[in-house]
């Protein structure tokens, strides 16, 4: 599986994200600029310039009309994807660690860090659009709601929306997961103890009914949205920064590696700077993809399940298009089940 190396960022990557159609890849880094790339060949379409500090997070709406960024410069910006212009800016009292659009694209959440006496919160912003063109008509100048860190929880590090935007799920610095009911004024529903260390990433399944987490405690979990029940556990031998669920195939991809401060004294093999593929059902590692010479900070997979991208501490994005062997891979038990199904159909 040959990688396309995308060079454009000067500092470590913080997040990569595909649009819904999978033809564009969005990336942000600690160099204060975001980039948009063609996912087919890795050509850069343009940059989003305007932040003055690290951009921690980026997301694009379901129409590929607008994308949102959250930065350490105490601001959130909304961008027109077609021309790269900033169309709205929101000021924040603290750095913004994560942003994500709701499934309908009319709202987005932003995680505010718990620093400088700020308790930490998940702020919800509304974007009003033309129903026919999906063009922006009005934005809420202030958050329409603030989910303040619930008692007994540390501040949120990651968050996302479930199916139809019914719930918001958040991962926290103390390794816990919490759940909020959007239709009931974002009321706190429940929380569970999951990781031993801070949750570094959380990404949802294609149907938004379950999600995967990663943590520096070297573990990754698959969790059901409705019950917060742990479905699967994936154990590794290195700190994890990112995790994603693959469409089409029953796989998950994990990424991480040794702490960035120790990278200069460590070889790529010892640092474990690989994307690791696990079977989603059987919880077994099935392969690794090397290439980065630093920890993997972020991994994203195209909604069509035909390619994935990884962003590293080394400042590079590696774009991989899956080959036939990836789609053909099956466990013996999977082959036997398919053969049995074909026999039943024949009879």
From Swiss-Prot:
<dbReference type="GO" id="GO:0010494">
    <property type="term" value="C:cytoplasmic stress granule"/>
</dbReference>
<feature type="repeat" description="WD 4">
    <location>
        <begin position="194"/>
        <end position="233"/>
    </location>
</feature>
<keyword id="KW-0853">WD repeat</keyword>
<keyword id="KW-0648">Protein biosynthesis</keyword>
<dbReference type="GO" id="GO:0016282">
    <property type="term" value="C:eukaryotic 43S preinitiation complex"/>
</dbReference>
<dbReference type="GO" id="GO:0001732">
    <property type="term" value="P:formation of cytoplasmic translation initiation complex"/>
</dbReference>
<comment type="subunit">
    <text>The eukaryotic translation initiation factor 3 (eIF-3) core complex is composed of TIF32, PRT1, NIP1, TIF34 and TIF35. The factors eIF-1, eIF-2, eIF-3, TIF5/eIF-5 and methionyl-tRNAi form a multifactor complex (MFC) that may bind to the 40S ribosome.</text>
</comment>
<dbReference type="InterPro" id="IPR019775">
    <property type="entry name" value="WD40_repeat_CS"/>
</dbReference>
<dbReference type="GO" id="GO:0006413">
    <property type="term" value="P:translational initiation"/>
</dbReference>
<keyword id="KW-0963">Cytoplasm</keyword>
<comment type="similarity">
    <text>Belongs to the eIF-3 subunit I family.</text>
</comment>
<dbReference type="InterPro" id="IPR015943">
    <property type="entry name" value="WD40/YVTN_repeat-like_dom_sf"/>
</dbReference>
<feature type="repeat" description="WD 3">
    <location>
        <begin position="149"/>
        <end position="190"/>
    </location>
</feature>
<protein>
    <recommendedName>
        <fullName>Eukaryotic translation initiation factor 3 subunit I</fullName>
    </recommendedName>
</protein>
<comment type="function">
    <text>Component of the eukaryotic translation initiation factor 3 (eIF-3) complex, which is involved in protein synthesis of a specialized repertoire of mRNAs and, together with other initiation factors, stimulates binding of mRNA and methionyl-tRNAi to the 40S ribosome. The eIF-3 complex specifically targets and initiates translation of a subset of mRNAs involved in cell proliferation.</text>
</comment>
<dbReference type="GO" id="GO:0071541">
    <property type="term" value="C:eukaryotic translation initiation factor 3 complex, eIF3m"/>
</dbReference>
<feature type="repeat" description="WD 1">
    <location>
        <begin position="8"/>
        <end position="47"/>
    </location>
</feature>
<feature type="repeat" description="WD 2">
    <location>
        <begin position="50"/>
        <end position="89"/>
    </location>
</feature>
<keyword id="KW-0597">Phosphoprotein</keyword>
<keyword id="KW-0677">Repeat</keyword>
<dbReference type="Pfam" id="PF24805">
    <property type="entry name" value="EIF3I"/>
</dbReference>
<dbReference type="GO" id="GO:0002188">
    <property type="term" value="P:translation reinitiation"/>
</dbReference>
<feature type="modified residue" description="Phosphoserine">
    <location>
        <position position="302"/>
    </location>
</feature>
<feature type="repeat" description="WD 5">
    <location>
        <begin position="291"/>
        <end position="330"/>
    </location>
</feature>
<dbReference type="InterPro" id="IPR001680">
    <property type="entry name" value="WD40_rpt"/>
</dbReference>
<dbReference type="GO" id="GO:0043614">
    <property type="term" value="C:multi-eIF complex"/>
</dbReference>
<dbReference type="GO" id="GO:0002183">
    <property type="term" value="P:cytoplasmic translational initiation"/>
</dbReference>
<keyword id="KW-0396">Initiation factor</keyword>
<dbReference type="GO" id="GO:0005852">
    <property type="term" value="C:eukaryotic translation initiation factor 3 complex"/>
</dbReference>
<dbReference type="GO" id="GO:0033290">
    <property type="term" value="C:eukaryotic 48S preinitiation complex"/>
</dbReference>
<dbReference type="InterPro" id="IPR027525">
    <property type="entry name" value="eIF3i"/>
</dbReference>
<dbReference type="InterPro" id="IPR036322">
    <property type="entry name" value="WD40_repeat_dom_sf"/>
</dbReference>
<dbReference type="GO" id="GO:0003743">
    <property type="term" value="F:translation initiation factor activity"/>
</dbReference>
<dbReference type="GO" id="GO:0003723">
    <property type="term" value="F:RNA binding"/>
</dbReference>
């Amino acid at each position: 599986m040959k990688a396309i190396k995308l060079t454009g960022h000067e500092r470590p990557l913080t997040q990569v994200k595909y649009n819904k159609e999978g033809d564009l890849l969005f990336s942000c880094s600690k160099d204060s600029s975001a980039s948009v790339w063609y996912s087919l060949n890795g050509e850069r379409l343009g940059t989003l310039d305007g932040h003055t500090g690290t951009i921690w997070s980026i997301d694009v709406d379901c129409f590929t009309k607008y994308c949102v960024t959250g930065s350490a410069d105490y601001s959130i910006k909304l961008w027109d994807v077609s021309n790269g212009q900033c169309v709205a800016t929101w000021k924040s009292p603290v750095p913004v660690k994560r942003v994500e659009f709701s499934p309908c694209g009319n709202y987005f959440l932003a995680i505010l860090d718990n620093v400088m006496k700020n308790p930490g919160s998940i702020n919800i912003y509304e974007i009003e659009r033309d129903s026919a063109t999906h063009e922006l008509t009005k934005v809420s100048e202030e958050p329409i709601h603030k989910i303040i860190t619930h008692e007994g929880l540390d501040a949120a590090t990651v968050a996302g929306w479930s199916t139809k935007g019914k719930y918001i799920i958040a991962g926290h610095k103390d390794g816990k997961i919490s759940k909020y009911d959007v239709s009931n004024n974002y009321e706190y529903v429940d929380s569970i103890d999951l990781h031993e260390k801070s949750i570094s990433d959380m990404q949802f399944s294609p149907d938004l009914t379950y999600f995967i987490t990663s943590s520096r405690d070297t573990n990754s979990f698959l969790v059901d949205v409705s019950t917060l029940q742990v479905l699967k556990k994936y154990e590794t031998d290195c700190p994890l920064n990112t995790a994603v669920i693959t469409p089409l195939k029953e796989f998950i991809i994990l990424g991480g590696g040794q702490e960035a401060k120790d990278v200069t004294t460590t070889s790529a093999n010892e640092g474990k700077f690989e994307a690791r593929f696990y079977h989603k059902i059987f919880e077994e590692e099935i392969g690794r993809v090397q290439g980065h010479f630093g920890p993997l900070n972020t991994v994203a997979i195209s909604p069509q399940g035909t390619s994935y991208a990884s962003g590293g501490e080394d400042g590079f994005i590696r774009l991989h298009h899956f080959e036939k062997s990836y789609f053909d891979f099956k466990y013996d038990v999977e082959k036997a089940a398919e053969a049995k199904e074909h026999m039943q159909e024949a009879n």
